[in-house]
Structure formats: structure tokens, C-alpha cells
């Protein structure tokens, strides 16, 4: 998994179909499959492009 930094233009940082997870120990979003566990994500949440 590649980390993605928060960009100032605030575009969705992941490919379509993936979701953005903000790990509890990081300030950079990571992209993961929507079926992945969100246990390590802030708010137990992985945000899809629709939620972005």
C-alpha cells in the first residue's frame, strides 16, 4: 500500500473504487479496498470518493 499525502487541492487521493483510510498513527491517507478492515483507520472509517 502506498501512502498518499494530504494535498492542498483536496482531491480524492485514491483510485476510483478504492477508499481513503487515515491511519491512527499517520497524517497521510492510505488507499485500500472497500472490503479491507478499517480497524486501524481514524473513526474506523474508510472514505469512498462519494463521501469525500
UniProtKB/Swiss-Prot annotation:
Keyword Secreted found: yes
Tissue: Expressed by the venom duct.
GO molecular function, one term: toxin activity
This protein's UniProt keywords: Disulfide bond, Ion channel impairing toxin, Neurotoxin, Secreted, Toxin
Chief subcellular location: secreted
GO cellular component: extracellular region
Record comment regarding domains: The cysteine framework is IX (C-C-C-C-C-C).
Disulfide bridge partners, by residue number: 14-31, 19-41, 21-46
Source organism: Californiconus californicus
Function per UniProt: Probable neurotoxin with unknown target. Possibly targets ion channels.
Compartment(s): Secreted
Domain of life the protein comes from: Eukaryota
Name this polypeptide is given: Conotoxin Cal9.2c
Propeptide: 1-6
